[in-house]
């Protein structure tokens, strides 16, 4: 830009039409700069700088030096599709450095309470909760969730999907794994640090939500401050998100003519929020870019450095804006005008050019939309819910009216049709044509039950229309209310809500209940996970354990890290929204991280009445045990059989834990021995015996620790036996393999030692002799087999276990176990869970319900207090800008009235002059 006058004139050319929903406004000042989202300078080439200063009349002819050769539309699409993605793995991570240019804030700051607000009530989806491994997988990407289809997040408080579902990405801040890089020409950009799937959530576009007067003032203010890059995004009509000084990493997403991301708006609670999503599968290392798709730079084009085959060579400019619409892609799809010829605003050459003096409404009216399909119905309802432009709402409603297919109409009704149409009525209540369109659609819907009408509360809105001055509106409103009054309410049995934190009565009930829960889950596009394995779960799964970081740790938490140790007596849990709270065994809960150990309540001394009751009970017990007469021979044999059976069933419950473990070990060992016998010719007998004992002890310890044993003497099921045998076989196969490798190595070491010694003693080394291995470890040779170090880690100390050789050799073997090359019972992924279970602390008690939400609001950190003060300052700025705007409008109105009055006075004076033939009216 050459001077401030050019900058001011260019700002005046910025269009603030509602159609520019996805506008991101950037303003360049004195120094010619590349169009980038970075907060730093990057020089243009000399040619680009000169060409960027061309006048408005020359702007249509973009310099060829900056512009690649033109390709046909089909050729450019083929090149873009076949081109391998460019990776930026070689660039350093500049995330920390990029934070120096702006203030990171966790959420948008609103200039007033009504900014960003929507008229939609919190709507409930029809999904059913799908609990797997403690996580609710309902409302996922592949589900048929109507909230997700209409771009609305489910409530954290829970509904049909039981809360905590997968359609809460904005609320949980489940951002993608990205980093900030510094490109050669475009400045800062965003790089994917892991593979991303289509429609993955990258970032919410966060900043200060301001009104239009504040937006205009800031454009001038930033220019005076010398700020090179502005970051404005149009959120709604006369509402903007300004991420210039405050925001998050989403502000660094650059422009591309062949984007891999798109910007979309979602309803989250009572606010409309903007997010960046992936449009295709993205490899790790790719830059994340989207198409700005709007005239933000006046009539003069700015060079585009995306480097794509279909690059038009510039961003903005007269040529591009004549041929492209500023409507977002989602609205274009909802209008049904992205048909066979395509709707590609990034390609300069189009089948049908937009006339220079033609606006978006005229352009859309000239294109015939395609017929409504089920997929289109979802897009139409999603766009209609957020629509504030009357002409767009009319086109969307007309698409619904023109549809006569019953299945499509049912799909429209399913997409919260009554609630969305109620919002449309309230938005355009003063326009009789729009109201009549909505009433005709409501009358067209099939009427089966009264449920949807009653739940949407649309009757109250229709009731007000019965008194309308417009006869058609009043009559149709009365007709609808009369028809709805004849419908009956269908009652449904509410589904039982599954509480993942509720403890089961016992481990067997927990497994069987989980299995039934999974069997009853019905999903149109998901496959239920297999039924959990019954006890004992020795081998469990061979796959390594991983935590689901995408769902739990996707966002950057403002709280301290919770993996640090808590004070004694405190435990953590998460509510349905994913917020972490803390609790004690006594049920005390708090949102604030505790710093002191939980105080144990002092044991209350028994009262006098309690002492007397205990004494009486003790006497009764003694009399019962000693004074009960034995059964005489008179008793019938049948009567004598029942009590011993009951005693037998209850006997094991009175035994100590070690006795129960021994009984359970005897139950497991026959199945373990069955596999051991098949390896008697592969491993020494004594070692096999020791392996069997240690494996049995390990399985017993694990099952008792995890409460998987109900009756230690009960026979095992076929499934349990199969799992145990498979685990023992896998373990012994690895033992045989390692045994053979070590035997071969020991033999080679022995031969080498014999050659070195050149003596008869070395040549005669055999059974029971000791040789030095290459690693300096003493190896016991038994019939040419080195088994001294074959050992397994037992759960507890063992005495009398079978071993080889003398006690000295046993002690040596115990000392060398850690360095033994042989497999142990803790080797391999199959035993990873068992080992982790032993090292874990005792399981915490089940968490109580979370504290009230009001308590969470009271926990205000210093950062939150600072953000609150900044938001209050932003509110004052918006109010001041609005006040000045209103005063300017009022002053202009007075000036117009004064000018009109002066003009009338002048005309009157002229009329009174001599010779005047006409008096002014």
UniProtKB/Swiss-Prot annotation:
Localization per Swiss-Prot or TrEMBL: Nucleus; Chromosome
Q: Which cysteines are joined by disulfide bonds?
A: none
- Bias (Basic and acidic residues): 508-519, 741-758, 865-895
> Which residue ranges does the record assign to the WW domain?
564-596
Q: Biased composition, Polar residues: where in the chain?
A: 24-37, 60-69, 521-530, 542-555, 624-636, 817-828
Record domain SET: where: 176-293
What is catalyzed by this enzyme? Answer: L-lysyl(36)-[histone H3] + 3 S-adenosyl-L-methionine = N(6),N(6),N(6)-trimethyl-L-lysyl(36)-[histone H3] + 3 S-adenosyl-L-homocysteine + 3 H(+)
Q: Where are the transmembrane segments?
A: none
This protein's species is Gibberella zeae (strain ATCC MYA-4620 / CBS 123657 / FGSC 9075 / NRRL 31084 / PH-1)
Q: Which CDD domains match?
A: SET_SETD2 (cd19172), WW (cd00201)
AWS domain location:
120-174
Q: Where is the composition biased (Pro residues)?
A: 842-853
**Which residue range or ranges hold the Post-SET domain?**
300-316
One cellular component term (GO) for this entry is: chromosome
Enzyme Commission identifier(s): 2.1.1.359
Name the chain's protein.
Histone-lysine N-methyltransferase, H3 lysine-36 specific
Outline the segment boundaries, as ranges, of region: Disordered.
Answer: 1-78, 346-365, 503-565, 624-647, 741-921
**What's written under domain?**
The AWS and SET domains are necessary for transcription repression.
Function of the molecule: Histone methyltransferase that trimethylates histone H3 'Lys-36' forming H3K36me3. Involved in transcription elongation as well as in transcription repression.
Q: Give an example GO molecular function.
A: histone H3K36 trimethyltransferase activity
């Amino acid at each position: 830009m050459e001077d401030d006058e050019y900058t001011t004139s260019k700002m005046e050319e910025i269009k603030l039409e509602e159609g520019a929903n996805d506008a991101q406004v950037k303003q360049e000042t004195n120094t010619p700069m590349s169009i980038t989202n970075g907060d730093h300078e990057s020089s243009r080439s000399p040619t680009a700088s000169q060409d960027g200063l061309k006048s408005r009349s020359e702007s249509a002819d973009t310099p060829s030096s900056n512009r690649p050769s033109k390709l046909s539309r089909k050729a450019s699409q083929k090149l873009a599709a076949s081109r391998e993605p460019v990776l930026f793995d070689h660039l350093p991570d500049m995330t920390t450095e990029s934070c120096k240019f702006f203030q990171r804030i966790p959420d948008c700051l609103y200039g007033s309470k009504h900014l960003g607000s929507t008229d939609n009530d919190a709507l409930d989806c029809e999904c059913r909760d799908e609990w797997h491994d403690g996580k609710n997988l309902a409302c996922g990407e592949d589900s048929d969730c109507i909230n997700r289809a209409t771009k609305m997040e489910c409530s954290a408080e829970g509904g049909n999907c039981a809360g905590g579902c997968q359609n809460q990405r904005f609320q949980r801040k489940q951002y993608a794994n990205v980093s900030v890089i510094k490109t050669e020409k475009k400045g800062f950009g965003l790089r994917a640090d892991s593979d991303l799937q289509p429609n993955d959530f990258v970032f919410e576009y966060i900043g200060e939500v301001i009104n239009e007067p504040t937006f205009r003032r800031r454009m001038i203010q930033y220019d005076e401050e010398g700020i090179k890059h502005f970051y404005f995004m149009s959120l709604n009509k006369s509402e903007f998100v300004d991420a210039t000084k405050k925001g998050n990493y989403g502000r660094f997403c650059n422009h591309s003519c062949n984007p891999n991301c798109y910007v979309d708006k979602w309803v989250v609670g009572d606010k409309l929020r903007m997010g960046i999503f992936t449009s295709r599968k993205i490899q790790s290392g790719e830059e994340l870019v989207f198409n700005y798709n709007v005239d933000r730079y006046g009539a003069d084009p700015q060079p585009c450095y995306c480097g794509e085959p279909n690059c038009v060579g510039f961003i903005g400019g007269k040529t591009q804006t004549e041929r492209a619409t500023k409507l977002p892609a989602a609205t274009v799809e909802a209008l049904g005008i992205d048909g066979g010829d395509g709707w590609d605003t990034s390609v300069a050459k189009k089948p049908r050019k937009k006339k220079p003096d033609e606006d978006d409404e005229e352009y859309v009216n000239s294109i015939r939309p395609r017929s409504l399909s089920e997929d289109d119905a979802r897009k139409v309802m999603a766009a209609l819910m957020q629509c504030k432009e009357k002409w767009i709402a009319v086109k969307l409603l007309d698409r619904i009216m023109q549809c006569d297919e019953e299945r499509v109409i049912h799909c429209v009704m399913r997409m919260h049709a009554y609630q969305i149409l109620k919002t449309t009525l309230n938005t355009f209540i003063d326009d009789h044509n729009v109201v009549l369109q909505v009433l005709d659609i409501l009358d067209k819907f099939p009427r089966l039950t009264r449920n949807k009408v009653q739940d949407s509360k649309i009757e109250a809105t229709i009731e007000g229309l019965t008194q309308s001055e417009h006869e058609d509106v009043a009559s149709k409103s009365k007709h609808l209310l009369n028809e709805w009054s004849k419908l009956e309410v269908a009652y449904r049995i509410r589904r039982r809500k599954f509480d993942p934190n509720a403890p089961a009565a016992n481990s067997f009930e927990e497994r069987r209940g989980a299995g039934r829960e999974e069997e009853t889950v019905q999903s149109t596009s998901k496959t239920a996970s297999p039924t959990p394995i019954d006890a004992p779960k020795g081998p469990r799964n061979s796959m390594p354990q991983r935590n689901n970081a995408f769902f739990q740790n996707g966002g950057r938490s403002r709280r301290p890290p919770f993996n640090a140790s808590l004070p004694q007596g405190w435990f953590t849990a998460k509510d349905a929204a994913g917020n972490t709270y803390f609790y004690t065994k006594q049920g005390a809960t708090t949102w604030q991280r505790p710093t002191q150990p939980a105080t144990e309540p002092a044991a209350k001394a028994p009262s006098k009445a309690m002492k007397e009751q205990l004494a009486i009970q003790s006497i009764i017990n003694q009399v019962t045990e000693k004074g009960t007469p034995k059964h005489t021979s008179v008793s019938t044999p049948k009567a004598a059989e029942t009590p011993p059976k009951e005693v037998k069933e209850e006997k094991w419950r009175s035994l100590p834990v070690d006795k129960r473990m021994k009984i359970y070990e005897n139950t497991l060992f026959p199945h373990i021995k069955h596999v051991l016998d098949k390896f008697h010719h592969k491993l020494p007998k004594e070692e096999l015996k020791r392996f069997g004992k240690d494996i049995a002890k390990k399985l017993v310890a694990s099952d008792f620790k995890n409460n998987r044993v109900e009756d230690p003497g009960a026979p095992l099921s076929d499934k349990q036996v199969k799992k145990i045998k498979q685990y023992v076989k896998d373990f012994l196969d690895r033992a045989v393999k390692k045994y053979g490798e070590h035997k071969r190595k020991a033999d080679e070491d022995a031969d080498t030692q014999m050659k070195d010694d050149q003596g008869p003693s070395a040549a005669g080394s055999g059974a029971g002799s000791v040789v030095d291995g290459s690693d300096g470890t003493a190896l016991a040779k038994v019939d040419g087999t080195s088994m001294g170090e074959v050992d397994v880690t037992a759960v507890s100390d063992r005495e009398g276990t079978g071993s080889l050789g003398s006690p000295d050799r046993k002690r040596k073997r115990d000392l060398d176990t850690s360095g033994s090359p042989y497999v142990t019972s803790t080797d391999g992924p199959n035993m990873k869970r068992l080992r982790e279970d032993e090292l874990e602390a005792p399981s915490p008690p089940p968490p109580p319900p979370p504290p009230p939400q009001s308590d969470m609001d009271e926990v205000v950190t210093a950062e939150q207090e600072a953000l609150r003060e900044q938001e209050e300052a932003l509110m004052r700025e918006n109010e001041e800008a609005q006040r000045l705007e209103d005063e300017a409008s009022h002053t202009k109105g007075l000036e117009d009235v004064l000018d009109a009055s002066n003009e009338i006075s002048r005309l009157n004076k002229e009329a009174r002059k001599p010779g005047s033939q006409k008096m002014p009216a």
